[in-house]
């Protein structure tokens, strides 16, 4: 009897070989991140602004320091001037010049103001009545002044307007030798701005100068320094 052979078809499903279906386009390759580098010009703008700001601050500080220094220096000058004042009373005039830093110009009481100076004339009844030229200069110096110095006709006319015609007054002009005239203030002697009487100066032995009135009017005359005369003192106005 012939044996029967049964054949069976066996299919083994290999999942590893199973097909995979993708939908859509293939995935694009991943891009590398890019670094955003700042341009040099973008950094220059804030740096320049910072430098300008620092410069403005420096200038402001410098200006403030200069103003403070000027004010402080002015304060020290005023303090020194007030400390050096030997006069108890002052007559002051308010300055009207807009550019004038100090607002008051002062002269001691009983002194006459003219221009930028104050003038004091000795009287017969005053403490400093009549004295030699050197004594007169010392008297003026003790009051913070010196003997009169004249550099213009306007000043000469002002002085003669407050003097007594019957008196003579020493001024701060003297002969240092060989007709070398000098002012006590050390300002230059200008021969073209002098007011000598006619024929004066007349003697090498007369080395000091007075201002007096003759028939021809007011003028200068040289006399011996030891003679006793009245005098005129002069000082700069006190600025407050």
Swiss-Prot record:
Disulfide bonds join 107-118, 140-233, 208-225. It is a single-pass type II membrane protein. N-acetyl-D-glucosamine binds at residues 211-213. Residues 70-240 are extracellular. Pfam families: Lectin_C. One of its GO terms (biological process) is negative regulation of cytokine production. Residues 129-235 form the C-type lectin domain. Keywords: Adaptive immunity, Calcium, Cell membrane, Disulfide bond, Glycoprotein, Immunity, Innate immunity, Lectin, Membrane, Metal-binding, Signal-anchor, Transmembrane, Transmembrane helix. One of its GO terms (cellular component) is external side of plasma membrane. Alpha-D-mannopyranose binds at residues 200-202, 206. The keyword Metal-binding applies. May interact with PTPN6 via its ITIM site. C-type lectin receptor that binds carbohydrates mannose and fucose but also weakly interacts with N-acetylglucosamine (GlcNAc) in a Ca(2+)-dependent manner. Involved in regulating immune reactivity. Once triggered by antigen, it is internalized by clathrin-dependent endocytosis and delivers its antigenic cargo into the antigen presentation pathway resulting in cross-priming of CD8(+) T cells. This cross-presentation and cross-priming are enhanced by TLR7 and TLR8 agonists with increased expansion of the CD8(+) T cells, high production of IFNG and TNF with reduced levels of IL4, IL5 and IL13. Contains 1 copy of a cytoplasmic motif that is referred to as the immunoreceptor tyrosine-based inhibitor motif (ITIM). This motif is involved in modulation of cellular responses. The phosphorylated ITIM motif can bind the SH2 domain of several SH2-containing phosphatases. This is C-type lectin domain family 4 member A. It comes from Rattus norvegicus (Rat).
């Amino acid at each position: 009897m012939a044996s029967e052979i049964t054949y069976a078809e066996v299919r083994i499903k290999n999942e590893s070989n199973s097909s995979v279906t993708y939908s859509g386009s293939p995935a694009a390759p991943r891009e590398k991140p890019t670094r955003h580098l700042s341009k040099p010009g973008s950094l220059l703008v804030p740096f320049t602004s910072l430098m300008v700001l620092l410069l403005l601050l420096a200038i402001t500080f410098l200006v403030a320091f200069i103003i403070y220094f000027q004010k402080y220096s002015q304060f020290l000058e005023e303090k020194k001037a007030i400390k050096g004042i030997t006069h108890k009373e002052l007559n002051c005039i308010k300055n009207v010049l807009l550019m004038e830093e100090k607002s008051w110009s002062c002269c001691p009481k009983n002194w006459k103001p003219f221009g930028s100076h104050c003038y004091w004339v000795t009287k017969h009844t005053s403490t400093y009545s009549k004295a030699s030229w050197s004594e007169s200069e010392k008297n003026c110096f003790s009051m913070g002044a010196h003997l009169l110095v004249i550099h213009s006709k306007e000043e000469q006319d002002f002085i003669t307007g407050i003097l007594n015609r019957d008196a003579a007054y020493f001024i701060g002009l003297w002969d240092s030798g060989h007709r070398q005239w000098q002012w006590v203030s050390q300002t230059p002697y200008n021969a073209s701005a002098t007011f000598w009487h006619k024929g004066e100066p007349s003697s090498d032995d007369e080395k000091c100068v007075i201002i007096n009135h003759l028939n021809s009017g007011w003028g200068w005359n040289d006399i011996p320094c030891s003679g006793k005369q009245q005098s005129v003192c002069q000082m700069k106005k006190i600025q407050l």
